[in-house]
UniProtKB/Swiss-Prot annotation:
Residues 28-33, 84-92, 140-155, 204-218, 265-267 are periplasmic. This is Aromatic amino acid exporter YddG. Belongs to the drug/metabolite transporter (DMT) superfamily. Aromatic amino acid/paraquat exporter (ArAA/P-E) (TC 2.A.7.17) family. It comes from the Bacteria. Amino acid transporter with broad substrate specificity. Can transport various amino acids, including phenylalanine, tyrosine, tryptophan, L-threonine, L-methionine, L-lysine, L-glutamate, L-valine and L-isoleucine. Overexpression confers resistance to phenylalanine and increases export of phenylalanine, tyrosine and tryptophan. Pfam families: EamA. SUPFAM superfamilies: Multidrug resistance efflux transporter EmrE (SSF103481). It is a multi-pass membrane protein. The keyword Transit peptide does not apply. It comes from Escherichia coli (strain K12). GO terms for molecular function: amino acid transmembrane transporter activity; aromatic amino acid transmembrane transporter activity. It catalyses: L-phenylalanine(in) = L-phenylalanine(out); L-tyrosine(in) = L-tyrosine(out); L-tryptophan(in) = L-tryptophan(out); L-threonine(in) = L-threonine(out). It is found in: Cell inner membrane. GO terms for biological process: amino acid export across plasma membrane.
Amino acid sequence: MTRQKATLIGLIAIVLWSTMVGLIRGVSEGLGPVGGAAAIYSLSGLLLIFTVGFPRIRQIPKGYLLAGSLLFVSYEICLALSLGYAATHHQAIEVGMVNYLWPSLTILFAILFNGQKTNWLIVPGLLLALVGVCWVLGGDNGLHYDEIINNITTSPLSYFLAFIGAFIWAAYCTVTNKYARGFNGITVFVLLTGASLWVYYFLTPQPEMIFSTPVMIKLISAAFTLGFAYAAWNVGILHGNVTIMAVGSYFTPVLSSALAAVLLSAPLSFSFWQGALMVCGGSLLCWLATRRG
């Protein structure tokens, strides 16, 4: 396989991941926030056994296995439930944007905990990403304090889970980089996520799961998307141009919002797109800070 082809396959993973906000929200409307997420990750985990493979548990570094599984499961649960508990389709897309603070936070964590060199660009990068999220939450008025507070109070749990999830994923990336030693535990982690969600589903009161044709289509699409995205990303990381893939991944907030708007039939305002571009720009500045550090 040529390097260009592998890079293209890796970039396809970014496109696939960008559909997850819309698909997870669509599935949760029929199967419930918890039941829908449990079904998605269970099916995805089974698919990953065939696309990525099941690792030999004993060979995986214990630190990575324990910390990685805890952080990965926690993050995926935060993400899925933040989207499922959102009050409206538009709010689900906003919640997804809050979660996209993770690229900037990942670089910050790499600087703080992994000794990543950096320069002054990291400060405006982090600030721009944070302002971008606030701009999105301000609705049509942009950076408007009262609108931001009013928006958050309509569904505080969703925004809280998305915000905490961004920090958890940044921590997961830091742990993986430091302790994985080339091992990939993604199949185990996704299966653990599904199992954890099923335990939560059966131990707590949950809405009835309503299986309709549209919901089943979205469920299968979400499971296959997640399964093939991780497989495609692995190909890109192993054989492609990692720099191009890294830059491409920082435009995920815009692509994800656009695809979610189509999947959920939720048109977005010009102010939203301004905020989304700020989040992307902030992430790119953080990345450039490490390249020139």
